[in-house]
Amino acid sequence: MKPSMRAKLDHLDTRLAELNSLLTSEEATKDMDAYRKLTREHSDIATVVEQFYLYKQAEADAQAAEEMRKDPEMKEFADEEQKQALATMEALESTLQKLLLPKDENDERNVFLEIRAGTGGDEGALFAGDLLRMYTRFAERQGWKVEVVSAAESDLGGYKEVVLRLVGQAVYSRLKFESGGHRVQRVPQTETQGRIHTSACTVAVMPETDELEAVKINPAELRIDTFRASGAGGQHINKTDSAIRITHLPTGTVVECQDDRSQHRNREQAMKVLVSRIMDAREREKHQLEAQTRKSLVGTGDRSDRIRTYNFPQGRITDHRINLTLYKIDAMMDGDIDDLCNALASEHQAELLAALGDN
């Protein structure tokens, strides 16, 4: 084990003892917010330290076996004991490396997922509808709740833009690598000559913030407009100005919400999306600065990056960041994207491990 890694583990061991003392003190529960933070930290560290204790026990066993090997009568037995102890140490070191990886504080959050049609006109909008179905079906498979925040439909039944709110367990951790450019190659329904067209959409996955206070927004910097909701019709459509459009003047960020009949709830939801977009822009700026010092294949989330191609004639989906091609496009467009999400998460973990090894 590298000295730097051992030093981190020794520090966590010391910190766990401090937390045990703090949590059992009479003062601990006087500030419940602070108490909850301490219990979360204790839970995170205890798992690591428990594995570190097992590692040190295996290390002691290996050293004891080395001493035992000096006795000729015990050498064969000692060799086997030492072999087992070293194998245990190797496995535990690998586990500890992963446990020490920096955690993304957003991993457990719900998300706003935004799909925008790019190049390709009507075909791009139809593909946006296909991506909407793919992510909706994937969310249903995970047991997540799906809410449509806003949707701008195209003439042929696709979407110029659609924003979803996905609520469930660890939503962001599963979908955070979906941000970027998605390209489709196929024969459009409107194509009479059978020619393959290329269209594109942009996907943005933004973690939902816990509190609006996470981003300080001056109300004077907001322009709030109300308008009549548009939709498929019905007795409740276009009767009141319940839809909300909020413009953040300093950044030019615009958010619309018309999913609810209540103007108050639409405004509340629009503010959540606005805060998430502003936070997302700041995170992307930070990641771009980090990328200048460390090349990351998976985790940049740059909207201008073409991350994936969906080739329908060949029945394949290719993720260009990890050079992975899967020939099951029909199943994947129906929400079966677990293999892709797992591969991207594994690549990201490998990058983090490599960075940890460099330190």
UniProtKB/Swiss-Prot annotation:
PTM comment: Methylated by PrmC. Methylation increases the termination efficiency of RF1.
Locations listed in the record: Cytoplasm
Principal subcellular localisation of the protein: cytoplasm
Residues the record lists as N5-methylglutamine modifications: Q235
Pfam families assigned: PCRF (PF03462), RF-1 (PF00472)
GO molecular function, one term: translation release factor activity, codon specific
GO cellular component: cytoplasm
InterPro entries: PCRF (IPR005139), Pep_chain_release_fac_I (IPR000352), Pep_chain_release_fac_I_sf (IPR045853), Prokaryotic/Mito_RF (IPR050057), RF-1 (IPR004373)
Entry superkingdom: Bacteria
Keywords, in A-Z order: Cytoplasm, Methylation, Protein biosynthesis
Family to which the UniProt record says this protein belongs: Belongs to the prokaryotic/mitochondrial release factor family.
Known function: Peptide chain release factor 1 directs the termination of translation in response to the peptide chain termination codons UAG and UAA.
The protein's name: Peptide chain release factor 1
Organism ancestry: Bacteria, Pseudomonadati, Pseudomonadota, Betaproteobacteria, Burkholderiales
Gene assigned in the entry: prfA
